[in-house]
Curated annotation (Swiss-Prot):
GO terms for biological process: nucleosome assembly. The lineage of its organism: Eukaryota, Fungi, Dikarya, Ascomycota, Pezizomycotina. GO terms for cellular component: nucleosome; nucleus. Its main location: nucleus. Keywords: Acetylation, Chromosome, DNA-binding, Methylation, Nucleosome core, Nucleus. The keyword Acetylation applies. The modification N6-glutaryllysine is found at K92. The nucleosome is a histone octamer containing two molecules each of H2A, H2B, H3 and H4 assembled in one H3-H4 heterotetramer and two H2A-H2B heterodimers. The octamer wraps approximately 147 bp of DNA. Core component of nucleosome. Nucleosomes wrap and compact DNA into chromatin, limiting DNA accessibility to the cellular machineries which require DNA as a template. Histones thereby play a central role in transcription regulation, DNA repair, DNA replication and chromosomal stability. DNA accessibility is regulated via a complex set of post-translational modifications of histones, also called histone code, and nucleosome remodeling. It comes from Neurospora crassa (strain ATCC 24698 / 74-OR23-1A / CBS 708.71 / DSM 1257 / FGSC 987). The modification N6-methyllysine is found at K6, K9, K13. Belongs to the histone H4 family. This is Histone H4.
Length: 103
C-alpha cells in the first residue's frame, strides 16, 4: 500500500470483485430436514406441513434483526469484519444473552 491510509482503494481503477452478491432467496437453504431436526431437539414429535415456511419466515426476521445490529456495531467501530463479539452484543441488545463467546 502506498500512503492511502486505512480503508479503501482510493481513486483510479477498482479491481475485480472478489465476492458477487447473489440475488436469490437463500432462506430456502434452510431445508425441511434441518427444521425437523431443530424441532426434534425442542421435543416436537409431529410437524405440520405448514410449519416449514412459517419457520423460515420467523428465522429470517430474527436473523435480519441480529445481523443489522451486529453490522451497526461493526460500522461504529470503523471495521469491515463482523466479529463474534459484535454478534454477542447484538443478541444481548435484543434480550437474548449468549455466553461462551467473550464479552
Amino acid at each position: 500500500m502506498t500512503g492511502r491510509g486505512k480503508g479503501g482503494k482510493g481513486l483510479g481503477k477498482g479491481g475485480a470483485k472478489r465476492h458477487r452478491k447473489i440475488l436469490r432467496d437463500n432462506i430456502q437453504g434452510i431445508t425441511k430436514p434441518a427444521i425437523r431436526r431443530l424441532a426434534r431437539r425442542g421435543g416436537v414429535k409431529r410437524i405440520s406441513a405448514m410449519i416449514y415456511e412459517e419457520t423460515r419466515g420467523v428465522l429470517k426476521t430474527f436473523l435480519e434483526g441480529v445481523i443489522r445490529d451486529a453490522v451497526t456495531y461493526t460500522e461504529h467501530a470503523k471495521r469491515k469484519t463482523v466479529t463474534s463479539l459484535d454478534v454477542v452484543y447484538a443478541l444481548k441488545r435484543q434480550g437474548r444473552t449468549l455466553y461462551g463467546f467473550g464479552g
